[in-house]
Structures are given as C-alpha cells and as structure tokens.
Swiss-Prot record:
Record-listed N6-acetyllysine modification sites: K74, K220
Binding site for Zn(2+): D176, H178, D264
Family the entry assigns: Belongs to the histone deacetylase family. HD type 1 subfamily.
Enzyme Commission identifier(s): 3.5.1.98, 3.5.1.-
Protein name: Histone deacetylase 1
Length: 482
C-alpha cells in the first residue's frame, strides 16, 4: 500500500461549544472540559484557518439504535439525576451509576459525541474531506446494551457502520491505554472490520484484549491485540506500531481508517501507566496518515487534562501538516499549562517493563496470525443505503458576492497560506490581529461588468469597506452546523 510523507490533505473538524459544560460529577476523572481546552488551544495556535470547522448535529435515538438496543437508548433518554430512584433496576441492568454516573444533560452529551463521529463518516464517504477530526468522540468501551468505562454510546461503532455503506473494509486502530473492547466486540465476527488495539494488559480495566483473542467465525484473525506492560516509551512503541500496522495494511488492505487517539497512554496520566511523550503518541497519527487513506481521528481516554489538550492540539497540527511552536500561545486556560507553558512534555524515569524480547515475541505471534488472513476479502455488491445525515444544501458558488458571508460559511473556509501573516505584537504562532486581515473585493469578469451599469460608477472607499470579510475572530466559538 502506497505511503506518502508530508502530503497536504483536506481536514474537517467537529466541535460544539456546549460540550465543555457537561460534568460527570465531583472527583470523577472524565472531564469533558478537556475538549473545550483543546479547542481553545488550537484556535490560539491559528489552526482553525487551515481546516473546515463544523458544529455536529445531535444524533437522535434512531441513529443510535443502528447499533445499541432500543431499551438501552430509551433508558439513556429518560434518566436524570432527579428521577434516578424510579430507575434503580434499569441502572443496574445497564451498568449506570458508578463509573458511568447519571449527570445533567447525559443524553445530550452522547448526542454531540455521536453526532460528530457519524457526521465525520458521512463527510469521508462523500469524499468531501480526507481527514475528519472529532475529539469529543472515541468512547470505545460502550456496549450494545451497557455503559462501561465512562462511555455510554459507542460513537466509533456507529461511525464505522456508516463507513461500511461505502467502504468494503474499514480498519480500526486504538492507541488508548485501555483495550478497545466495545469496538472489538461489535465487529468480532465480521471480516469487513479489522480491530487493532495496543493496550496495557493484566489486572487493568477492562481486563480484555488477550493476544489470543483473534475474532470468531468469519471474523477469525480480524481482531489484533497487542498486550503491553507498564512504562512503554516512545522508542519501544514506535518499534512495534510501525511493523504491525504495515503488515495489517498489506494483508487487510482497508479503504478507510478510524484512529482512536486516547491520550491516557501519555506519561503522567492520572489513570495511565505508560511513558509516551506527545511526539511519540503523534508518530502513530503521522504513520497512519502516511498511507493516504480516508481517515477519522477520534478522542478517547485522557485524564491529565492539560496534557490531553496539548496532545490533541499537536495531533490536529500533524493532520494539517503544520508545524507549531513549542511555546504555548496565550489562551483562556493558560494557567493550566504552568510552570513551563510549553506544548511538549518530557517522559518520566519510570522503568519500561516491556523488554525487547517480550515485544519481539508478541510481534512474531501477531505476524503468524496475520499470515492466516486471506488477502483482502471481497464483498458482494449491494445498493448503498441512505446516509445518516441528509445532503447539505446550498452551493458556495451561487452565493451573492455582494452580501456579507455568514459566520458558518466563514468557518468553513480555509485560508490560503499567503492570506495571513502574524501581527507585530503577536509574533510567530500567535493569534492574528483580525483588523489587519480583510478579504479583497471579488473581481468581476468583463461580461459581468458589461451587464452591471453600477460597476462603471466610481466606488468610494466607504463602499469598499462594506464588501470586506467579517473579522477572523468571529470564528472563535461559532461553528458550522453539520
């Protein structure tokens, strides 16, 4: 499979400003606020100018029940902190209450997370983007009829089901420290989805992901698990990730990839026990991207939230093929990043319990399993089902050039590299002084000038100003409805 280094690819990004308002409860390690921190940091790095930004639709119950059971989704829609006493039996049945608490807006949170992932899949299917990013997604532990590991609705499974409408084979890769059990379980008996998970194994949540778990029935050999021990570092991780993924690509030949970028595999994570730096983690993104396949990048775990924001901001830059400085720009959460206020983190001095012998032994066992695969299974031709999200209306080319563009349209536009330069005050990598960046008036063709008598009149400076683009800062929190 062809690999390319440093190829610029079109990126779209899903974010809803409300996502940071949801709160799992006091002392709970899962903090949706980290998504807002990530968004704010990448805004202040100026990355928003290089990609299309969309606000996800809220996925409805019908979309969710493409995988989840009806009664489970009905329960999630109904349960609230003030009526929990009425649902005590169902809470037990659906594993809601402790790790997966009931909180205000629980179902809306699931709708946003799922909406972004499903909309991303539709965008990729329509070839309207090369890479889609939804940091609010990646909730890989949720089961068909059960919440698990802080996850309620499995947005990944729903996004993959959407991709399967257009793609014969979809590859799922999971670099979260926890095993991607919910996704593996959903596709355990099919040969159209291969799941590959690199995770901590042995007396660690969720307890699954043994090397010998390889799939069943038609899906035999289509589940790949790389069990790891504490303290794995960048060098060891790269030494296993690249050869395993190269072999998987060669044997499975997917036409789309979903990458779950859980950042709890970073050094210093509140719940994790690996020793990866942000650069080491992002090398996985870079390597998968080099295969030049339609790619969905999702969030997942990550409980030292300042490092989550650092990691996902940097990985957004990697997707955009953009270098960003190590010096963090000033942002709304600047004090979180002290005392160094730098983007990158250093590894700790913890011992890497993954010896070269251990890693090599596991790698060879996985290679043996991968050799059992028939090369790229075929799929019977069928009519393509309807998309989960209706076609967007409106053609940009038909917009009236004399009308000020909406903020939604502004967010969707990607700035040319030459269109902006840093203001003197900000320096490299800083936010731009929006008053310095105005869009030139559209130049009319000779034919249009002939038809438009007004064009022959002299246009005053004041009239020109009305044609100018809205200020760049308007993009900050207003994002396009997907």
């Amino acid at each position: 499979m062809a690999q390319t280094q440093g190829t610029k690819r079109k990126v779209c990004y899903y974010y809803d400003g409300d996502v940071g308002n949801y709160y799992y409860g006091q002392g709970h390690p899962m903090k949706p606020h980290r998504i807002r921190m990530t968004h704010n940091l990448l805004l202040n790095y100026g990355l928003y100018r290089k990609m299309e930004i969309y606000r996800p639709h809220k996925a409805n119950a019908e979309e969710m029940t493409k995988y989840h059971s009806d009664d489970y989704i009905k329960f999630l829609r109904s349960i609230r902190p003030d009526n929990m006493s009425e649902y005590s039996k169902q809470m037990q049945r659906f594993n809601v209450g402790e790790d997966c608490p009931v909180f205000d807006g629980l179902f809306e949170f699931c709708q946003l997370s799922t909406g972004g992932s499903v909309a991303s899949a539709v965008k990729l299917n329509k070839q309207q983007t090369d890479i889609a990013v939804n940091w609010a997604g990646g909730l890989h532990h949720a089961k068909k009829s059960e919440a698990s590991g802080f996850c309620y609705v499995n947005d990944i499974v729903l996004a993959i089901l959407e991709l399967l409408k257009y793609h014969q084979r979809v590859l799922y890769i999971d670099i979260d420290i926890h095993h991607g059990d919910g996704v593996e379980e959903a596709f355990y008996t099919t040969d159209r989805v291969m799941t590959v998970s690199f995770h901590k194994y042995g007396e660690y949540f969720p307890g699954t992901g043994d090397l010998r778990d390889i799939g069943a029935g038609k899906g035999k050999y289509y589940a790949v698990n790389y069990p790891l021990r504490d303290g794995i570092d960048d060098e060891s991780y790269e030494a296993i990730f690249k050869p395993v993924m190269s072999k998987v690509m060669e044997m499975f030949q997917p036409s789309a990839v979903v990458l779950q970028c859980g950042s709890d595999s970073l050094s210093g994570d509140r719940l994790g026990c690996f020793n990866l730096t942000i650069k080491g983690h992002a090398k996985c993104v870079e390597f998968v991207k080099s295969f030049n396949l339609p790619m969905l990048m999702l969030g997942g775990g990550g409980y030292t939230i300042r490092n989550v924001a650092r990691c996902w901001t940097y990985e957004t830059a990697v997707a955009l093929d953009t270098e960003i400085p190590n010096e963090l720009p000033y942002n709304d959460y600047f004090e979180y990043f002290g005392p160094d206020f730098k983007l990158h983190i250093s590894p700790s001095n913890m011992t890497n319990q993954n010896t070269n012998e251990y890693l090599e032994k596991i790698k060879q066992r996985l290679f043996e399993n991968l050799r059992m695969l028939p090369h790229a299974p075929g799929v019977q031709m069928q009519a393509i089902p309807e998309d989960a999200i209706p076609e967007e209306s409106g053609d940009e080319d038909e917009e009236d050039p004399d009308k000020r563009i909406s903020i939604c349209s502004s967010d969707k536009r990607i700035a040319c590299e030459e269109e902006f330069s840093d203001s003197d005050e900000e320096g490299e990598g800083g936010r731009k002084n929006s008053s310095n960046f105005k869009k030139a008036k559209r130049v009319k063709t000779e034919d249009e000038k002939e038809k438009d008598p007004e064009e022959k009149k002299e246009v005053t400076e004041e009239e020109k100003t009305k044609e100018e683009k809205p200020e760049a800062k308007g993009v900050k929190e207003e994002v396009k409805m997907a």
